[in-house]
A protein has these predicted regions:
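Bacterial N-terminal signal peptides that target proteins for export
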Residues: 2-13
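Bacterial Sec-dependent N-terminal signal peptides
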Residues: 19-41
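Extended ligand-binding clefts on enzyme/binding-domain cores
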Residues: 36-88, 104-111, 146-152, 162-168, ...
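Aromatic-rich carbohydrate-recognition surfaces in CAZymes
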Residues: 107-114, 160-185
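Alpha-helical support elements that line or immediately flank enzyme active sites
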Residues: 115-127, 137
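Short coil/turn linking the two alpha-helices of tandem helical-hairpin repeats
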Residues: 124-125, 181-188, 255, 317, ...
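Active-site-adjacent structural elements in enzyme catalytic domains
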Residues: 132-139, 172-179, 185, 191-209
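Solenoid-like repeat scaffolds
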Residues: 388-397
Length: 420
């Protein structure tokens, strides 16, 4: 079994202990002051509203047969989840009933991988894989201290890898559980997906109230004023977010499930955040930007993390309804990359496209552009979808990120990324 780095539990400092004890802020208790609340019972969640149609670009644009599409997706899943552990797989079982997704290149486990892996498992009906990933994630949650309820992870900033509580993975995991509830509900003795989703959504929504304020620099997941998700739940991230962690489609589903109007407001704020962050000519998005859309120095280029924003833009259009800006954005981005050469464009650029910052032709970007092409209207969209079809998951050290992006793009382009 591959080795992996595990984030140590946060130490409980005296001040945090005293504050948490005085407020009685366990995840099953009423919170602080007049903002107190009780976790919702998963049974009270409303059903999600699925769109009536999921376009299948592989079939309807490329003319691929259903059998060929099914075989391609099965091959990708089997390679990533059950392939050769030394060169193909990123999913590994541990203990009797758990599993994790390994970032092979960095030799660590990230909540982004766990969350995307759970989404893939729900969409493909792989309940055993889903349950194993969730049990691993739940076992790794901070059990006490200011970060109680968050998941430990690792993040990159430039070439630096650091421990973090990454909102990207937290949001993916919560949404995967919500979709699992819609697909399978909960049989006696099995995981109560609705209850687990409710607990995570309450953590996301009310973490700061649970802590009776900001404790040891730990904040809530969302800024209550702008209604944007923080880059990290820390005061160090005040006024900063990432386009890749804005997920308005998810927030609209959370509104449907909980009835909380905050989530629709967060969805609108996220869409506007994309608009003000994207370059008006190329459509390229920075890694980080202030809440007002100004790129953050040192994170002001379009590189690998930014690719994930494209999937979120597409899902918002597919799941929630027509988003005219999303179509325009897709056209801008694909026109830019078509001008760079569909088979040769680089993996990183300055936002205006004038400077290459990563010359590698990245499979993960081919996948993201292929997904964008689903909602684009320019003629070149066909070439981007075809390029995505011809991708096979990478083998070797870099297979984690590209493999997950390819799997997501295949589900989106085959009409199999659905709401349950």
């Amino acid at each position: 079994m591959p080795t992996r780095r595990v984030v140590p539990r946060l130490a409980q400092v005296g001040l945090a202990l005293a504050l948490l004890t005085s407020c009685k802020t366990t995840l099953h208790s009423i919170g602080c002051g007049e903002n107190g609340y009780t976790l919702k019972d998963g049974a009270t969640l409303a059903p999600l509203r699925a769109p009536g149609f999921y376009p299948n670009a592989f079939r309807d644009v490329l003319g691929k047969s259903d059998a060929d599409i099914t075989a391609k997706i099965a091959a990708t899943f089997n390679q990533l989840f059950h392939g050769d552990p030394s060169s193909q797989a990123i999913y590994f079982t541990t203990g009797t009933d758990q599993a994790y997704i390994l970032d092979v290149l960095h030799d660590d486990v990230r909540t982004e991988g766990i969350g995307i892996g759970m989404l893939i498992a729900v969409e493909l009906g792989k309940r055993d894989e889903l349950d194993r990933l969730w049990r691993y994630a739940k076992a790794s949650q901070y059990a006490s201290g200011p970060s109680q309820g968050y998941f430990p992870s690792f993040c990159n900033k430039g070439t630096t890898v650091f421990e973090c509580d990454d909102p990207f993975g937290l949001q993916q995991i919560a949404t995967a559980l919500l979709l699992a509830r819609g697909r399978w509900m909960s049989a006696p003795g099995s995981i109560d997906y609705g209850r687990e989703a409710s607990k995570l959504l309450d953590i996301i929504r009310y973490k700061q109230e649970y802590n009776c304020g900001i404790v040891d620099d730990v904040t809530g997941t969302f800024d209550p004023s702008s209604k944007l998700v923080y880059d990290m739940p820390s005061i160090d991230s005040a006024n900063t977010s990432r386009p890749a962690i804005a997920m308005p489609a998810y927030y609209e589903l959370w509104r449907q499930a909980t009835g909380d109007a905050f989530w629709s407001e967060a969805a609108s704020a996220s869409r506007n955040y994309w608009m003000v962050s994207a370059n008006a000519t190329t459509g390229l998005l920075p890694t980080r930007a202030t809440f007002g859309g100004t790129p953050v120095p040192g994170s002001d280029t379009f590189i690998t993390e930014s690719y994930r924003a494209f999937f979120n833009i597409v899902l918002d259009h597919l799941w929630i309804g027509s988003q005219p800006w999303a179509v325009d954005e897709s056209n801008r981005v694909l026109q830019f990359f078509a001008g760079q050469g569909i088979d040769t464009y680089a993996g990183g650029y300055s936002l205006d496209g004038s400077t290459v910052v990563d010359a590698t032709h990245q499979d993960s970007l081919v996948a993201a552009n292929g997904a964008l092409a689903l909602i684009a209207t320019i003629d070149q969209r066909v070439s981007f979808i075809d390029a995505m079809w011809n991708l096979a998951p990478y083998t070797g050290k870099s297979r984690y990120y590209s493999g997950l992006m390819i799997m997501l793009a295949q589900l989106i382009l085959s009409g199999q990324m659905v709401v349950y």
